[in-house]
Design a protein with these regions (language model features):
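A polyanion-binding, active-site-adjacent surface
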Residues: 2-88
Length: 88
């Protein structure tokens, strides 16, 4: 199995773990809503891993934009804050 496929498989396992953690977070903390982007954005994430995971790199940078222009502020994935502001 190539590296990209291994990364995709690992991401699927992580997604299952996140799905199991969400109800716990919602019950035990002040979190009202939680989503798992590995579910709703899976096809795109998998394509990314399969395409770029086999390029021989030694580092895979993953992250989230929690700043004032990111999903943590609006709940809108991929930083589409303009869309959220004009719609809401």
């Amino acid at each position: 199995m190539d590296i990209g496929a291994q990364l995709a498989e690992a991401a699927q396992r992580l997604s299952v773990m996140c799905d199991a953690a969400i109800p716990v977070l919602e019950k035990k903390t002040i979190v009202a809503h939680a989503t798992n982007p590995l579910n709703y954005a899976w096809p795109h994430h998998e394509q990314y891993l399969l395409k770029w995971g086999n390029r021989g790199g030694h580092t895979l940078l993953l992250g989230m934009n929690p700043g004032p222009w990111g999903m943590a502020q609006t709940g809108v994935p991929f930083g589409a804050t303009g869309v959220a502001q004009s719609f809401l």
